[in-house]
Amino acid sequence: MTRTILFILGGVLLGGIIHIVIVFLVPLYAGNDAWAEMGRFGPDRQFHMLPAPEAGAEPIPGMDPRMLQAVCRFDLGNGPLRVQAELPDEFWSVAVFDRRGRNVYSLNDRAAEGQKLDLAILTAVQMAQLRQSPPASLENAIVVDLPIQAGFVLLRAFIPDDSMLPSAHTALAGANCSGTF
């Protein structure tokens, strides 16, 4: 009788341990990370307007319906990235995410000076090379080195009312996401 109870307890304990390990390993084996998911909107190093959020079918979880959003996927192995945009007077923000969708850098209209966004994203090695001969075109740019190889940039503009939608859409559609300095 005692032996049977020990076997049952051992089986339940082993089953619980295996279950917990599998649950923690799922993200490592999931093929659809955030970076891969952003690839469905279009080619890398170009901003793509995200569709308006619909309940249960948001392109990015937790999207605000009063924000217009554009995404640019990148791989710094192909060179540094430069993000440039003339943004509306209302609130805007730019955020850089790693492959898994973790925010590694963000900036908004209050932290930046004016409505012109000029952001250069590099790896530490690219930053060291850039310091040896910095181009004059980066004089007014915000230059950041990030500990990531690939990720995506999310550019958001607040739409306080529908009359602001055309200007915000024009601003995000005109945003540039390339490797040219």
Regions found by a protein language model. Give the residues of each.
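A compositional/structural signature for long, glycine/proline-rich flexible linkers
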Residues: 1-181
